[in-house]
């Protein structure tokens, strides 16, 4: 590495808000299954506190050694609906509390996996877990929850979609932060290091390390140097910058896996913003020539950014996965917040952007009075985009306050302006239930 590359890396960290967003340890809990829920909870606590006991210390040591901030250390576990199904319990809150207790003991920021996979229907444990979500998130501090309600191979479980509209409302009513820790997915991935949607897939190794990087500020600074150049130059600039960011992520992941003695999983190529000025995906899009995010051209700019991040990242690291693309959470991106406040960005434009980027309608506050059926219809729309386009989409929305209010989540989750929602009813549509079939192009065997 020549001196120019060294100084570039230092500038990325000191001036451009580059950091490793998360080191996430995925842990299988399949060997914790027990017919007695209290025994299952005890086994879960013991396994997590044994396997992840050094995760935070190792993360801090690597950060100090490399001089690169590692913002979060997290754990993801096997979907708890699979563990709870062996018990006779009608309530999985004790398992959520075991996760929370373990997370606090080892000092991680969040623990994900209070989850269910219901894309084609409910099993016993799925229904119990989903109905346990509001209390589980209200009575814990670090637990995150997710539900997969659709996939390209199976279509969309509209009964589950309707249920999740109700569950999101109940969760928001029971606790201020609960809905911010609940994600509804289509095409959920098994190796996602980012919260709140992380869970450890059953096809994964017993314990793995997955890494998520963050570098919107680095990309913006690189684009500032090519103002007025053609899109060919813009694309090449983003690709080269993504390569550097991902290379560092791979180094951190490999070091962590060696120190902890566990398998290295993937680097998630996602560009994840924070509420800090200079760490915004929206400002990257504006640097391409948009007056403000939300205006015409926004979706095209996001498409270029997303694709070139993937191309640069894949060149830098063999093991890539997770969500891998640009995140557009409203509350966690100061540029997105500004665009909502000035009226240039609305829910409909955000939905169009989700056809391009990672995840979907993320960290968006909507009026508290929004009906559960309308929330369910938003989930259905996002799921349709994911299922038809063979990509991950999701909804993480928070029904709080009234239109125009500002909802404060604090720290990494930021602040969200309450956005306008279409007032026309979707109730009769959602009441149908059943399954929207898989698209024709899913039939590939």
From Swiss-Prot:
**InterPro entries in UniProt:** UPF0210 (IPR007841)
UniProt signal peptide: none
- Which Pfam families does the entry mention? DUF711
Sequence similarity: Belongs to the UPF0210 family.
**Which NCBIfam families did the record assign?**
PRK05313.1
Q: How does it assemble?
A: Homodimer.
- Please report the name of this protein according to its UniProt entry: UPF0210 protein SSA_2018
